[in-house]
């Protein structure tokens, strides 16, 4: 019998309702806002069969992707082999996590500037840091108490200010501060110092400035500006590292699911959505779009995570298509 975590059906049902609503809007052509409707098509192409999987491996929902300093690509999925590593040419290196309860609520992975891998688990309410040797170096959050399942739909059911309630993503400031988008339950952003001490949190469920409805992804730019994918409100919110509100961007036709931000002096943000990827500058202008909804190669189905090691390369984790795509500029 397949073991299922009691928290996941609620999460997936909520995501399904959100995606169906967004898809209806996208297919009808209604709700196009701002410059997204006028943005050009990005000159990206799919690199077919880039990843060389072991013949016996079958992926589950592909929900995370990250690239380390060596150019190795890490794929996170909800199958029996939850974490896979490929080299820069797409050759399979290893798989990790088979049979581990740690990956029951796998949600996302990131590499910090020191090349440590951070894993976000929405079921255990934990964010786990692994060092370069793959050893657990730090854990933020804690497993929920049994009574939490009985109060799952109650706002603020987790009273500990440093605890999470279905966290979704992580990013880091230049001073080592850690920011967690938290998430399906708490609808806030939590800040920790470089030693892992809780500093502050901001936001609650709502649609006002600084409020969130499922903050699903978070990144920071070279100017130390934070960008939060406020998925349930179909918008992007912008803050400084103290949580002060700066801007809100409403110029995408669908909800933002995932972010990556390119390195280098001229940064851009790639945004994954239901069946499309958007490219934005740091002022929020939509520079281009790519893709349309579908499950055949070249289309996209729930872009749950994106990674962009440079401006001309995007890796897209498609949750419902159960695959990871490599896209490159033509």
Question: Language-model features: where?
Answer:
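Sec/Tat signal peptide C-region and signal peptidase I cleavage site
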Residues: 23-25
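Bacterial N-terminal signal peptides
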Residues: 9-21
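Bacterial N-terminal signal peptides that target proteins for export
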Residues: 1-11
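Eukaryotic scaffold repeat domains enriched in small/polar residues
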Residues: 27-330
């Amino acid at each position: 019998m397949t073991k299922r975590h009691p928290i996941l059906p609620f999460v997936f049902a909520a995501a399904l309702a959100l995606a169906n609503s967004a898809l209806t809007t996208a297919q009808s052509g209604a709700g196009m806002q701002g410059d997204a409707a006028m943005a050009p098509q990005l000159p990206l192409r799919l690199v077919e069969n880039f990843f060389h999987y072991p013949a016996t491996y079958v992926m589950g929902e592909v929900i995370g992707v990250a690239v380390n300093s060596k150019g190795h690509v890490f794929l996170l999925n909800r199958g029996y082999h939850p974490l896979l590593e490929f080299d820069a040419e797409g050759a399979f290196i290893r798989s990790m996590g088979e049979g581990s309860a740690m990956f029951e609520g796998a949600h996302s992975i990131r590499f910090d500037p020191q090349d440590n891998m951070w894993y976000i688990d929405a079921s255990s309410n934990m964010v786990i840091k692994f060092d370069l040797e793959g050893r657990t170096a730090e854990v933020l959050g804690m497993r929920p108490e049994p009574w939490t399942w009985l109060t799952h739909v109650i706002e603020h059911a987790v009273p500990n200010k440093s605890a999470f309630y279905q966290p979704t993503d992580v990013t880091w400031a230049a001073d080592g501060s850690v920011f967690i988008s938290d998430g399906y339950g708490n609808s806030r952003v939590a800040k920790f110092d470089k030693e892992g001490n809780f500093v502050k949190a901001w936001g609650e469920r709502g649609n006002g400035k600084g409020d969130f409805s499922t903050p699903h992804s978070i990144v920071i730019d070279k100017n130390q500006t934070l960008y939060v994918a406020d998925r349930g409100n179909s918008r992007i919110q912008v803050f400084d590292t103290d949580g002060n509100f700066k801007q809100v961007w409403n110029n995408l036709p669908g909800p933002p699911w995932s972010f990556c931000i390119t390195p280098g002096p001229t940064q851009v943000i790639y945004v994954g959505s239901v069946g499309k990827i958007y490219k934005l500058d740091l002022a929020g202008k939509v520079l281009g779009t790519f893709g349309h909804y579908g499950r055949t190669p070249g289309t996209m189905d729930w872009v749950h995570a994106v990674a962009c090691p440079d401006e001309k390369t995007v890796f897209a984790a498609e949750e419902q298509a159960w695959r990871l795509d490599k896209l490159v500029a033509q």
